[in-house]
């Protein structure tokens, strides 16, 4: 609705002025679309801004915060306390513990030395106890028992007769059994410490008797005697408690002595010291000593 104001003017041109004003007012409402466009431009610019909010999507960062949680869970700080608990300081005390064991082994070697030296001083005083008449008589019985023939007809050499003692069917004669009992009884009456030198004197007496006798059967002893003395008796000067033996006779003493030492304790059930040897106090020398 348009209102017109009428003024009293003589000319009617004034009526046209309001008509000019209306078209001037008409473009004015056309300007507001610019105003509408102006706000529309910033608003769509501001709208993508909230659309660009991937930043709330960054709450994944707390998921990434689990990595620092894994850092304390890492075993590396656990290994760090393990390193101060290294076994190297534990091995260091083990080494000083092993070192006292070496001085412990040294006294063992020191104890073993007197043990090996003990039988030698024991044999020397025991060899001095041999000259008693009763012991010589007892040893002569054992010597006769070892040299006696234990078969019916044939006379067995020394080595064969000693080995035959292990065979029960060979010893059949009563005389052999009687002398065996006498020898075992008399050997049991001797002190245990003096049994070893007693057996040594038996061995020496047997070997010396084989050297003197010429009516010995064929065997190892007779062949050795023929090579040494050509069938002639060998006389050696003998001191009380000590007998001189030729170097060539050591093999003979070793064979006879080992057999006697093995057979007599088994036959008589008598204990003999383990350090007993067939040589004992017998010294090596030449025929003129």
UniProtKB/Swiss-Prot annotation:
The keyword Cytoplasm applies. SMART domains: AAI. InterPro entries: Bifun_inhib/LTP/seed_sf (IPR036312), Bifunc_inhib/LTP/seed_store (IPR016140), Glia_glutenin (IPR001954). Residues 18-40, 60-131 have a biased composition (Low complexity). Residues 1-132 are annotated as: Disordered. Developing endosperm. Residues 41-59 have a biased composition (Pro residues). Residues 1-10 have a biased composition (Polar residues). GO terms for molecular function: nutrient reservoir activity. Belongs to the gliadin/glutenin family. Sulfur-rich hordein which possesses an N-terminal half composed of proline-glutamine blocks organized in repeating units and a C-terminal half where the repeats are dispersed and less conserved. Has a role in the transport and targeting of prolamins to the vacuole of developing barley endosperm. This is Gamma-hordein-3.
């Amino acid at each position: 609705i348009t209102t017109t104001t009428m003024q009293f003017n003589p000319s009617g041109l004034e009526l046209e002025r309001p008509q000019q004003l209306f078209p001037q007012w008409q473009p004015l409402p056309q300007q507001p679309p610019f105003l509408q466009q102006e706000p529309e431009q910033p608003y769509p610019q501001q709208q993508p801004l909230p659309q660009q909010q991937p930043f709330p999507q960054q709450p994944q960062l707390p998921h990434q915060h689990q990595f620092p949680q894994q850092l304390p869970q890492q075993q590396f700080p656990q290994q760090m306390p393990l390193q101060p608990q290294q076994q190297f300081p534990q091995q260091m005390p083990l080494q000083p513990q092993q070192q006292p064991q070496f001085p412990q082994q040294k006294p063992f070697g020191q104890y073993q030395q007197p043990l090996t030296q003990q039988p030698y001083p024991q044999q020397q005083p025991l060899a001095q106890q041999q000259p008693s008449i009763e012991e010589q008589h007892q040893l002569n019985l054992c010597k006769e028992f070892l040299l006696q023939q234990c078969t019916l007809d044939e006379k067995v050499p020394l080595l064969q007769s000693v080995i035959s003692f292990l065979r029960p069917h060979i010893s059949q004669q009563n005389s052999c059994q009687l002398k065996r009992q006498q020898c075992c009884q008399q050997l049991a009456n001797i002190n245990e410490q003096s049994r070893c030198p007693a057996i040594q004197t038996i061995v020496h007496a047997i070997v010396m008797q084989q050297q003197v006798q010429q009516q010995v059967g064929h065997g190892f002893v007779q062949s050795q005697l023929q090579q040494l003395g050509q069938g002639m008796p060998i006389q050696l000067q003998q001191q009380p408690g000590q007998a001189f033996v030729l170097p060539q006779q050591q093999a003979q003493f070793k064979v006879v002595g080992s057999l006697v030492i093995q057979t007599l304790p088994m036959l008589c059930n008598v204990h003999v010291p383990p350090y007993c040897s067939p040589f004992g106090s017998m010294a090596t020398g030449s025929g003129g000593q």
